[in-house]
Amino acid sequence: MAQHFSLAACDVVGFDLDHTLCCYNLPESARLIYNSFAQFLVKEKGYDKGLLTVTPEDWDFCCKGLALDLEDGNFIKLADNGTVLRASHGTKMLSAEALAEEFGRKEWKHFMPDTGMAFRSGKYYFYDNYFDLPGALLCARVVDSLTKQNNGQKPFDFWKDIVAGIQHNYKMSAFKENCGIYFPEIKRDPGKYLHTCPESVKKWLRQLKNAGKILMLITSSHSDYCRLLCQYILGNDFEDLFDIVITNALKPGFFSHLPSQRPFRTLENDEEREALPFLDKPGWYSQGNAVHLYELLKKMTGKPEPKVVYFGDSMHSDIFPACHYSNWETVLILEELRGDKDGKPEESEPEEKKGKYEGSKAKPLNTSSKKWGSFFIDSVSGLENREDSLVYTWSCKRISAYSTIAIPSIEAIAELPLDYKFTRFSSNNSKTAGYYPNPPLVLSNAGKLTAK
């Protein structure tokens, strides 16, 4: 595999929408998402009213890369080899002694190397993006409440109520019906929750299109919500930017399902209509699958194997499936890179090659957590004073395994030439090679870590 990656070499450029092209005001959107679920649990399911009150300190619990064991109410931070680095019961962190007693040095009971372990199952749930994180705090506080009520009795059975809350607030008809709290509030005051795309990003999208690239938008958001977001962040003519728009894509199934399991559907007034046996032309569609999409891309490019790159923020929904099932190049939007503005590792890109990188912007909500430590590395419990006790997290391992490159935002690369050569993640390069503009400082400063 080539050591470098360039957008100029790609025929097709695809984008996720939420937290990729569309950037949210995270403190405000997090509160809104939390409240939409908490209100439902309290008013519809009879949960403790204390869930409705959240202090600023409570948000420190939120950290990407955690797994929730749905039966015992434990949140888990995994090392790259599947052992448990930190854990909490609800919001209560386990001590080193309790951690050793509960988990030892063995693999977490649900761990299977990479492709064998789904992000979501009936037994656990991984939190890997900023849309999910408020739910992690809510679930942890639910566990606290139920533990107090039931004297610690397990297993827990609250997940069905969380799923009901998702359905209530985000079902396909919720936007049109003004159902729940989330959509009505976004419609009422989009500027409170959404950031418009910088002019540099809009110009970059047009530059890609003018260079002959096919541009795609593939989002699991429904068409009506997608339209509201895109009109606000890109303008009313946003459809002119994209050759193909796919909403309600139901990722990751979009990439993993067979065409017969997930056909494309036409849309009429934001309502899904007939299932299509194949795609014969560009346009706006709902649901679908990567196989039929790729056949259309072959037709549009006139190439037997058009090269596709896909930008997304979720390892579960975007990066892993696009890489693993479709063999696309993948660009991970990793907000955690925005916090690294106070120093430059030795292997950082030369200043004159850098795109516009807004390091001075306010740090996103909880890119680091006092409770959970770094998203990228951690020390093995009980060995904190030993230099070689630092290990990669499971989340960090997956970044280098399934991402072509990782960037803090699209804006960070929007002013680079399209033929700019990014150093890619690969087995031949260091684990920090694919981070742009710099590797996370915590990785650069850690030296040689223990890789399991």
UniProtKB/Swiss-Prot annotation:
Residues at which Mg(2+) binds: D16, D18, D313
Keyword Magnesium in record: yes
Biased composition (Basic and acidic residues): 339-361
Record-linked InterPro entries: HAD-like_sf, HAD-SF_hydro_IG_5-nucl, HAD_sf
Highest taxon of the lineage: Eukaryota
Coiled coil stretches, renumbered: none
Modified residues (N6-acetyllysine): K171
GO terms of molecular function: 5'-nucleotidase activity; metal ion binding
Active site annotation, chain numbering: D16 (nucleophile), D18 (proton donor)
EC number(s) stated in the UniProt entry for this protein: 3.1.3.-
Keyword Magnesium: yes
Keywords: Acetylation, Hydrolase, Magnesium, Metal-binding
Chain residue ranges for the region called Disordered: 339-365
Family note: Belongs to the 5'(3')-deoxyribonucleotidase family.
The protein's name: 5'-nucleotidase domain-containing protein 1
Organism listed in the record: Bos taurus
Lineage of producing organism: Eukaryota, Metazoa, Chordata, Craniata, Vertebrata
Originating gene: NT5DC1
